[in-house]
Amino acid sequence: MKRKKFIASALLAIPTLSFAGIINFDRKKINTDQGPKKGIVIRADESRFNGKLTKPKDAFLHCKVSSVDTQEGLFIQTSTPKIFERIGGPPPHIHKYEDETIYVVSGEFVVHIEGEDIKVKTGDTAFIPRGTLHTIINPIENNPGTVVVICSPAPKKVEDFFGYISENGSISPDIVPLGWD
């Protein structure tokens, strides 16, 4: 067998061997006793902070997938119009341990990444790897826009932080997660 064909065959075999359980890529052991026992649906007006379904009327944010549900692997939240009543946003910050993805469902925003301001609009996505200085800025008073924010991994403290903001609309220094500078 020629060298190119051998290498191509070997590379093509990796996914098959992985699915067959012959190759294990050191995945984190997952405790399947925790989290929901079946799929869940969270409606537009619902929130799931701490794995508990609620219908908050005056929330700034809605939790859609709780870190409790994913064993701290993932946290997904959506904004509500209330959070974008004023122009501005949180100060630029760094997450040492979490990647953050921002998806613009509707409206226009500015994502600040490593000193650069980037305008984002409906359908745009910003991926911010851990260790990157960033923030999201609302440039419009009473912005009707909506964003989805995804954090991964998502320690419980991350969800608690956003839960506090959802209820209070502000940030308390004593709830900032470890590694958020």
Residue ranges and their predicted role:
Residues 139-181:
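Double-stranded beta-helix
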Residues 115-130:
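Short acidic-glycine-tyrosine-enriched beta hairpin
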Residues 111-112, 128, 134-141, 147-149:
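Short beta-strand His + acidic residue motifs that chelate non-heme Fe in jelly-roll/DSBH
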Residues 53-92:
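A short glycine-rich, His/Asp/Glu-containing loop-to-beta-strand
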Residues 80-82, 94-111:
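Short, conserved beta-strand element in jelly-roll/cupin
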Residues 20-57:
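C-terminal segment of N-terminal export signals and the immediately downstream linker at the start
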Residues 3-26:
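N-terminal export signals
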